[in-house]
Amino acid sequence: MIDGQTTEPKQKTRIILAPMQGLVDDVMRDLLTRIGGYDECVSEFVRITHTVHSRATWLKYVPEIANGNKTFSGTPCTVQLLGSDADNMAANALEAVRFGADKIDLNFGCPAPTVNRHKGGAILLKEPELIFHIVKTLRERLPAHIPLTAKMRLGYEDKSPALECACAIAEGGACGLTVHARTKAEGYEPPAHWEWIRKIRDSVDIPVTANGDVFSLQDYIGIKTISGCNSVMLGRGAVIRPDLARQIKQYENGGPVKDTDFAEVSKWIRQFFELCLTKEANNKYPIARLKQWLGMMKKTFDPAQTLFDRVRTVKDADEVRRILNAFEHEINV
């Protein structure tokens, strides 16, 4: 990619920020959608077990509900549920809607062993009939105007159930499906099998969103071309390269495509830390989240490694703020 390059206008693609548990919480959603390029984001999953969650619980995980289901930059946010009890998932979905949620997504893709042991996420890909029952139950009980979508992987151990599970989701009544192009067993090991997204897209009559291994504009062009999808979900790539969605929109709009520099990134880092402090005015949460993010970005931005080294052993938020301010000044001199 060349800074300043201009392209012809492309067919519009929806760019969605992925739900990533423990990584893209409401603060990260807020920041990344402020940077721009996103048409929608999806919340971290809200785990559904044997209880019906209170309003306080919904707002803890998806505070966007109280803001008209939008991040503070105005990007729509969808509520994601994870579970296997169709009746209780439906009851919770109805409560979320009662409190203001206007779109529900179902998680059939989480690869976390703890989640899978409790019959949630990707383990359900072993049971297409149960997936169908869950989707059908929620679709029948939710108000007709509330969109119901789902996210899945290609399977648990292998890809053999991929088409059956996708069809179960579509036939159950979902109006959209996101496919992460790996099995649970593959975790996040490359490569993502983008060609399988096309197979699924060709097998169902609902819109399919492509997801997996999009870390650059070139990756985006590749997944869109191979999958044939007009909707792409960004996951880890969105965190590692915070301006990725913005670059994609520049490309799609036919304008100049320009990489960010670390002077701009340093401003986002400081802003992120301040947003974390606003959420929890203590030392633990803001510092842990900052170190997590820097630890991911240092693979792409060399100065992130330098900044990570400076804050790695710091445990006081005021000291971290001082380091961030000094580093930003240093970068911008």
Swiss-Prot record:
Cofactors (names): FMN
Residues flagged as site, Interacts with tRNA: 47, 107, 188, 289, 291, 312
UniProt: FMN binding residues: 19-21, 80, 151, 211-213, 235-236
SUPFAM superfamilies in UniProt: FMN-linked oxidoreductases
Keyword RNA-binding in record: yes
Swiss-Prot/TrEMBL catalytic activity: 5,6-dihydrouridine(16) in tRNA + NADP(+) = uridine(16) in tRNA + NADPH + H(+); 5,6-dihydrouridine(16) in tRNA + NAD(+) = uridine(16) in tRNA + NADH + H(+)
Presence of keyword RNA-binding: yes
Family annotation (HAMAP family): DusC_subfam (MF_02043)
Similarity annotation: Belongs to the Dus family. DusC subfamily.
Protein name (record): tRNA-dihydrouridine(16) synthase
Native source species: Neisseria meningitidis serogroup A / serotype 4A (strain DSM 15465 / Z2491)
Gene giving rise to this polypeptide: dusC
